[in-house]
Amino acid sequence: MDLIFDIEGNGLLREVSKIWMLCAEDMNTGITYDFCDYEPGCYPLREYKDLMYEAKSVTGHFILGYDLPALEKVDGFILPKEVKVRDTLLMSQTLDYMRFGHDGHSLDRWGEYLGIPKPVHEVWTEYSEEMLHRC
């Protein structure tokens, strides 16, 4: 299974103490998985580990700098070493470090470039439904 995933937490890595959700898609089948304890229809958050342990590879934007370290910090989750990791932020920076000039390589900037704006969300200390859409 090759997953693309994202998490939402209650702060930046230094402050994060709560993971609100993890959303993933199997890139081979297109099946999506939403893990969140606050929305009906989502899998319980604690079950994300079972999916991640099945993965042959995981892909995401800034997952080496935030998502994976946040999961380890908050929940003790460590991805098995044999799982391939693709961080699209690092890939973007490596392939063309000046792609957007000094605007960086954020998902916000990529969203603008591709015409798919990332939903704006500013309050991370409390859960909101908008987080699920953003994730």
Feature map (PLM): residue ranges:
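Conserved Rossmann-like nucleotide-cofactor binding loop
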Residues: 10
